[in-house]
């Protein structure tokens, strides 16, 4: 007898794992540092089922804690699975609370897996004629499919697939769903550690089941098999039988099908709201709880475009691409290019929305749109160009949006004279100081526009940086942000110009009619993201950091990047010749010490020489493939074991110096400007520091003599001096401020050498009696201990025994007791909140701070100690940079800021501005933030970077 009822039974853990791993590269971390990926993904999946399928009855099955009958029968059952990720373990109780709030029954029976609970209920429901859907990605459920019982299978790329009898038969190439058990019994199931028959794969299993029908019949007729296959099957009869037992889902679990208890009920919205608020699912509340309910349950809104722009982070396609690290891959032979369509089915696109995107390609249209843009207080802008390097890119077009769902694209011709005329018409729009300029990586657009003689003026809002401030560990690209915050799938640039490679087109190759929708979408989506993210900034107490520190820095970086820096290429050529000869000499020394020639660049050959031939240590570390580990870290620890190790390290250092800097830097000179224009990245390091690329200036070695040759090649403009200013011991000063340690504060206020003062305290001697070795050890302790260095680590760094290292650390904390208290307090705060903060409330999330793994937890604890210090130092120099830039602007200073490296600022300064520039720079650096101890900046002058610093 058929029924109008529709029963959904969900396999909780299978879906939770899928949700967690869907976000594995970009986990969803809230302001408390809690990983909400599994919860968010599960809720979105549940909502999608409630909305799309409108079940009349529903239940969620969980595996019980403790072993099941399969574990008792087979100790290795699921033994190879990695321990449950801590984020999942912590999420499960919350997910259960959410399910309770939805008033959905949780189904759990001691000793039986969720598979067996669902199998029992689904089988009984099917017998009663109830249409039943088992929602799971696990392949073994295929054995339960009948006329009334279906698999509701999540696809790898999003969306769902309903599988009935014919679908299961087709996927497994079998005659009956019941034969799924026989297939698994023969081929095994690696995800559950079901052994199967060794040497029998899927195709062989299909062939055997097609011929014999079942494992039992196969084992009774092994005489019909031949050769190696016969031997395999006969040798493993017991294992095959046992594997089938493990793969068989039980349908007689002691649980009753009580349909009245599975009826879908109205959710407890107050409870859901409370949980979602605690998890900081603010926009999920808008999408799930503030819309009309249907069919007695909470459902997702279908949403207009306006609603979409304000909607919650909806899942990326919940089920990642094939080959990802996920549990229970559903049918190993599933294939297909479903990604694009499946993804679009879950997200809004331009095709599903009513947007007014206009191509502005006549003088009349341009004049009209300019007047319209000038009246707006907010302007979202974007540029289309010929390349990704802003100093070389040519404008192809400009797009603008001032109202959601409306945008305008202005093509710019190839002819530079004509292009300048059009861009110049829009100068009043860009230079209108009364309108807020919104962009996604707006620094790029500003540099491109300045190459056309136009400055972007007025307050700025960069959506990429806004998201970085909120979630520094995640990606910040527009496509990703649109999916997460707007539930929207953007047009990808590859759809216009093709995939990367030699055949990829240029935007200039396309007709404006083929570009304008893409370009308009960029400006429109950026405006929508701004409207969402500005609320998030306010709710997360991040407005000061964003508006007062990060945004004022953008025009500074535009200026630095456009200024560029000159290189003394002749000096680099001479250095190249010198270091190449030095490398060749060291090579010969290495061969003599080793007693043979070998490829020094080959880690394999280096390992064989060091550990097989020279046997410098007894037990050398190896990789999984059996190759010796010869990393820099390993060789550093072995430096004292044999002279050849020192030489190999020296050789590697020179090779890196040549390849990364000395020979590479001249290749980065822009032929148009004759300068190197490094790119400064505001959204890369989670610490808040700036990073740089092309070239990476942050990693230039500065302590050894060889590294100094690189700095010598950086020179000022003609008729100018090179000026360098850097903070003195800023991180120690911040530690003194944060810890409020009286002894450390007194040392700084007395203007003592902090390392000598520390040594005097530790060794209990007068300051005048501190020798160079004592000071060196105290300096190592000062910088090492604030980074949470261990006794072992300090001993290694100082090349002393652990007893002396421990005494030094104990003496340090006795000298600065409040420093130790600060360190302990920082860890405690991180454990309670999941994050720590800088002076300016920049958050560093530490999801592993409560990990049960001591190594992982220890790393998080060290970050808890150091992140507020390092991050505050980064914030302070950003403040100083913005203020110096403003002073230069208002006072008409011609000097240029040309480089920033960690705590150091560098300038090209006309000789006649020498005294004034030094005065401004030092004043602004030392007054960037008021602390318990003064900030101090040292400076120097020269004809190159090396002389100045």
Model-based region annotation:
Residues 505-508, 562, 670, 677-678, ...:
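Conserved catalytic core of nucleic-acid polymerases
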Residues 1-62, 66-78, 90-97, 237, ...:
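Extended, highly charged clamp/arch subdomains and adjacent linkers
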Residues 537-549, 553, 876, 880-901, ...:
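Active-site palm subdomain of RNA-directed nucleic acid polymerases
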Residues 7-8, 18-57, 75-76, 80-87, ...:
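Conserved RNase H-like, two-metal-ion catalytic cores of nucleic-acid enzymes
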Residues 2-4, 25-29, 79-254, 483-485:
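Extended two-metal-dependent nuclease catalytic cores across DNA- and RNA-processing enzymes
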Residues 76-90, 146-174, 230-232, 408-426, ...:
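Short alpha-helix plus adjacent loop in nuclease-associated cores
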Residues 9-10, 134-136, 379-381, 460-461, ...:
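Short hydrophobic beta-strand that contains or immediately precedes a catalytic carboxylate
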Residues 236-413, 440, 473, 481, ...:
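Conserved "right-hand" nucleotidyltransferase catalytic core of DNA-directed polymerases
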């Amino acid at each position: 007898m058929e029924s109008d009822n529709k029963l959904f039974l969900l396999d909780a853990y299978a879906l939770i794992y899928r949700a967690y791993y869907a976000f594995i590269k970009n986990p969803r971390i809230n302001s408390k540092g809690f990983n909400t990926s599994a919860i968010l993904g599960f809720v979105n999946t549940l909502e999608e089922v409630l909305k799309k399928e409108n079940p009349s009855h529903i239940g969620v099955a969980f595996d019980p804690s403790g072993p099941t009958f399969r574990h008792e029968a087979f100790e290795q059952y699921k033994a190879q699975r990695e321990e449950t990720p801590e984020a999942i373990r912590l999420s499960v109780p919350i997910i259960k609370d959410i399910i309770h709030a939805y008033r959905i029954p949780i189904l759990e029976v001691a000793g039986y897996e969720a598979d067996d609970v669902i199998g029992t209920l689904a089988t009984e429901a099917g017998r009663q004629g109830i249409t039943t859907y088992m929602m799971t990605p696990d392949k073994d459920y295929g054995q339960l499919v009948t006329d009334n019982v279906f698999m509701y299978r999540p696809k790898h790329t999003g969306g769902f697939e309903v599988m009935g009898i014919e679908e299961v038969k087709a996927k497994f190439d079998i005659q009956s769903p019941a034969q799924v058990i026989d297939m698994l019994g023969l081929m095994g199931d690696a995800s559950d550690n079901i052994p199967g028959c060794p040497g029998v794969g899927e195709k062989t299993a299909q062939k055997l089941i097609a011929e014999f029908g079942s494992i039992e019949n196969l084992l009774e007729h092994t005489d019909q098999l031949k050769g190696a296959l016969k031997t395999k099957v006969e040798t493993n009869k017991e294992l095959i039988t046992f594997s089938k037992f493990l793969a068989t889902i039980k349908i007689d679990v002691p649980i009753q099908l009580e349909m009245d208890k599975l009826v879908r009920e109205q959710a407890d919205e107050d409870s859901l709201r409370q949980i979602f608020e605690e998890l900081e699912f603010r926009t999920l509340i808008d999408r799930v709880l503030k819309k009309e309910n249907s069919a007695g349950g909470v459902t997702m809104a279908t949403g207009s475009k306006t609603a979409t722009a304000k909607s919650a982070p909806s899942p990326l396609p919940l089920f990642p691409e094939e080959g990802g690290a996920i549990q229970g891959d559903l049918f190993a032979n599933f294939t297909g290019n479903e990604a694009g369509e499946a993804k679009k089915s879950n997200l809004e696109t331009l095709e599903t929305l009513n947007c007014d995107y206009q191509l502005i390609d006549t003088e009349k249209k341009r004049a009209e749109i300019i007047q319209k843009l000038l009246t707006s207080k907010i302007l979202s802008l974007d540029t289309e160009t010929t390349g990704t390097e802003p100093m070389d890119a040519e404008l192809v077009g400009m797009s603008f949006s001032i109202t959601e769902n409306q945008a305008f694209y202005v093509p710019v011709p190839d002819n530079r004279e004509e292009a300048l005329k059009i861009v110049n018409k829009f100068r009043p729009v860009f230079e209108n100081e009364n309108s807020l300029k919104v962009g996604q990586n707006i620094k790029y657009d500003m540099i491109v526009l300045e190459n056309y003689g136009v400055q972007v003026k007025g307050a700025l809002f960069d959506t990429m940086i806004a998201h970085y401030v909120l979630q520094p560990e995640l990606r910040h690209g527009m496509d990703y942000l649109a999916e997460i915050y707007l539930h929207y799938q953007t047009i990808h640039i590859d759809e216009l110009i093709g995939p990367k490679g030699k055949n990829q087109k240029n935007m200039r190759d396309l007709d404006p009619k083929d570009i304008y929708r893409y370009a308009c979408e960029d400006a429109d989506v950026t405006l929508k993201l701004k409207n969402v993210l500005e609320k998030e900034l306010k709710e997360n107490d991040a407005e000061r950091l964003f508006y007062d520190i990060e945004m004022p820095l953008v025009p500074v970086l535009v200026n630095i990047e456009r200024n560029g820096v000159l290189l003394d290429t002749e000096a680099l050529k001479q250095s190249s010749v010198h270091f190449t000869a030095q490398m060749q000499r060291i090579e010969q020394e290495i061969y003599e010490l080793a007693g043979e020639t070998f490829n020094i660049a080959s880690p394999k050959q280096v390992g064989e020489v060091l550990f097989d031939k020279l046997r410098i240590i007894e037990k050398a570390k190896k990789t999984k493939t059996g190759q010796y580990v010869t990393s820099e870290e390993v060789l550093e620890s072995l430096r004292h074991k044999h002279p050849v190790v020192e030489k190999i390290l020296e050789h590697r250092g020179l090779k890196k110096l040549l390849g990364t800097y000395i020979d590479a830097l001249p290749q980065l000179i822009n032929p148009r400007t004759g300068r190197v224009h490094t790119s400064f990245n505001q959204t890369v390091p989670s610490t808040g520091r700036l990073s740089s690329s092309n070239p990476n200036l942050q990693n230039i070695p500065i302590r050894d003599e060889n590294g100094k040759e690189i700095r010598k090649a950086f020179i000022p403009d003609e008729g100018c001096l090179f000026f360098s200013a850097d903070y003195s011991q800023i991180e120690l000063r911040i530690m003194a401020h944060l810890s409020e340690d009286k002894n450390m504060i007194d040392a700084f206020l007395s203007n003592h050498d902090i390392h000598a003062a520390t040594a005097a305290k530790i060794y209990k001697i007068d300051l005048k009696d501190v020798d160079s070795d004592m000071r060196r050890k105290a300096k190592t302790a000062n910088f090492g201990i604030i980074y949470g260095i261990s006794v072992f680590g300090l001993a290694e760094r100082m090349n002393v025994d652990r007893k002396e290292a421990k005494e030094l650390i104990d003496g340090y904390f006795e000298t600065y007791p409040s420093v130790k208290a600060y360190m302990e307090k920082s860890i405690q705060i991180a454990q309670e909140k999941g994050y720590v903060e800088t002076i300016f409330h920049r958050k560093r999330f530490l999801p592993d701070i409560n990990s049960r793994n001591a190594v992982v937890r220890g790393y998080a604890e060290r970050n808890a100690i150091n992140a507020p210090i390092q991050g505050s130092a980064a914030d302070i120099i950003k403040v100083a940079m913005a203020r110096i830039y403003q002073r230069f602007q208002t006072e008409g200073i011609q000097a240029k800021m040309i480089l920033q490296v960690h705590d150091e600022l560098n300038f090209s300064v006309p000789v006649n501005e020498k005294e004034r520039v030094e005065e401004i720079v030092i004043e602004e650096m030392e007054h960037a933030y008021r602390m318990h101890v003064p900030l101090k900046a040292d400076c120097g002058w020269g004809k190159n970077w090396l002389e100045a610093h």
